[in-house]
């Protein structure tokens, strides 16, 4: 598979309005310029409109509820109906139970959607991988948003996570996240066995988001 650059837009100011549309156009450019898959993990409120600009969009969360009377919840079917590629679930800023994760993965698979399941530890990554999501993102929460890259500060977390997932679910890709800021951080993550990276502030707070995504993508691209 191609290396993956997943950008969690979170709720930064640049995740909405014209900034979000510009980011989607930038992601499309990078995906054309480099042989790397770029995924935008967007807020629910504008995910479908961004998917009209760039086709590889996930939502940041989904709930294990069916369509119907569930005010304020996001059924997985909503992502399918809006033409999105997939859903992210269990980010450290929005943790869910294992039963919740299991239900979302099962429903998404039945609808042909991808799932990026987040995990804080190698052990949690392996448990998530048992459910057969498309990808698992391993992010030590204490490094998220710090600019201290997991690939440099805690490389053993990546190697242990990759090994743990491979033992239980060899087909599930592992992304490394937390503190990934520069191209060198992304390159090192791939060298440690990850299939890509999950980033947020490095891109969302960058003065030049296109340039930052290009830097990260080029660092992971296979020669």
From Swiss-Prot:
It is found in: Cytoplasm. This is Triosephosphate isomerase. The keyword Cytoplasm applies. SUPFAM superfamilies: Triosephosphate isomerase (TIM) (SSF51351). Keywords: Cytoplasm, Gluconeogenesis, Glycolysis, Isomerase. GO terms for cellular component: cytoplasm. Pathway: Carbohydrate biosynthesis; gluconeogenesis; Carbohydrate degradation; glycolysis; D-glyceraldehyde 3-phosphate from glycerone phosphate: step 1/1. Involved in the gluconeogenesis. Catalyzes stereospecifically the conversion of dihydroxyacetone phosphate (DHAP) to D-glyceraldehyde-3-phosphate (G3P). One of its GO terms (biological process) is glycolytic process. Homotetramer; dimer of dimers. It comes from Aeropyrum pernix (strain ATCC 700893 / DSM 11879 / JCM 9820 / NBRC 100138 / K1). InterPro entries: Aldolase_TIM, TIM_sf, Triosephosphate_isomerase, Triosephosphate_isomerase_arc, Triosephosphate_isomerase_AS. The keyword Disulfide bond does not apply. The active site is at 91 (electrophile), 139 (proton acceptor). Its EC number is 5.3.1.1. The gene is tpiA. It comes from the Archaea. NCBIfam families: PRK04302.1 (NF003302), tim (TIGR00419). Substrate binds at residues 8-10, 144, 179, 200-201. GO terms for molecular function: triose-phosphate isomerase activity. Disulfide bonds: none annotated. Its main location: cytoplasm. It catalyses: D-glyceraldehyde 3-phosphate = dihydroxyacetone phosphate. Belongs to the triosephosphate isomerase family.
């Amino acid at each position: 598979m191609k290396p993956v650059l997943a950008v969690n837009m979170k709720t930064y100011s640049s995740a909405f309005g014209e900034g979000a549309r510009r980011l989607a156009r930038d992601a499309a450019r990078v995906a054309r310029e480099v042989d790397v898959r770029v995924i935008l993990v967007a807020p629910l409120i504008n995910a479908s409109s961004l998917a009209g600009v760039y086709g590889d969009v996930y939502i940041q969360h989904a709930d294990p509820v069916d369509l119907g009377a569930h005010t304020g919840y996001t059924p997985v079917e909503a992502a399918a109906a809006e033409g999105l590629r997939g859903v992210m679930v269990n980010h450290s800023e929005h943790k869910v139970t294992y039963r919740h994760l299991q239900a979302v993965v099962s429903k998404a698979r039945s609808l042909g959607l991808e799932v990026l399941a987040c995990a804080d530890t190698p052990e949690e990554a392996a448990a998530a991988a048992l459910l057969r999501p498309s990808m698992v993102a391993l992010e030590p929460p204490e490094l998220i948003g710090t600019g201290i890259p997991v690939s440099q500060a805690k490389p053993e977390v990546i190697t242990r996570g990759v090994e743990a997932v491979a033992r239980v679910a060899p087909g599930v890709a592992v992304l490394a996240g937390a503190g990934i800021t520069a191209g060198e951080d992304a390159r090192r993550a791939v060298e440690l066995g990850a299939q890509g990276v999950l980033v947020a502030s490095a891109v969302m707070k960058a003065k030049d988001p296109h340039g930052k995504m290009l830097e990260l993508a080029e660092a992971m691209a296979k020669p």
